Amino acid sequence: MVKGSTRMVWIVVALVLVSMLYGGYQYAVFSPYRVSSEKAKDMIQNNNIDVILDVRTDMERSTLGYYPGSIHVPRADLEHRIMADYPNKDTRIIVYCNTGHRARMATDALQEMGYHNARYISSTYASLM
């Protein structure tokens, strides 16, 4: 009986993990503020973006590289720094991270702060190249 109970616990744990991963994916991908990498590239090339914002950690940026000319403000520091660095709420911002999750959170925060031209991509900076 214990063996069957252990197996059931592992099945439940696996289902919870899959559900969490799927939920995280859904969160990163489905938002009115998400733009495709292709659209973001087009916006950048046509000078329709003022700031390319990297919200990854220092270690991620130094290890994995970054988009040339991007501004680095780790997600944890965003609310404290963005208004000081970019007081104009009309600033056109594209946000990126590694998976889209933090970029979405940052974009939601920017929208709440009044930066209504903030958008994000749900892929890495390399997709903008």
Residue ranges and their predicted role:
Residues 2-66:
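Flexible, polar/low-complexity N-terminal or interdomain linker segments that lie immediately upstream
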Residues 44, 52, 57-93:
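Extracytoplasmic/periplasmic/luminal assembly and interaction segments
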Residues 50, 66-68, 108, 118:
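Surface-exposed beta-strand edges and their flanking turn/coil or helix-capping segments
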Residues 79-129:
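Catalytic cysteine-centered active loop of the rhodanese-like fold, especially the PTP/DSP P-loop
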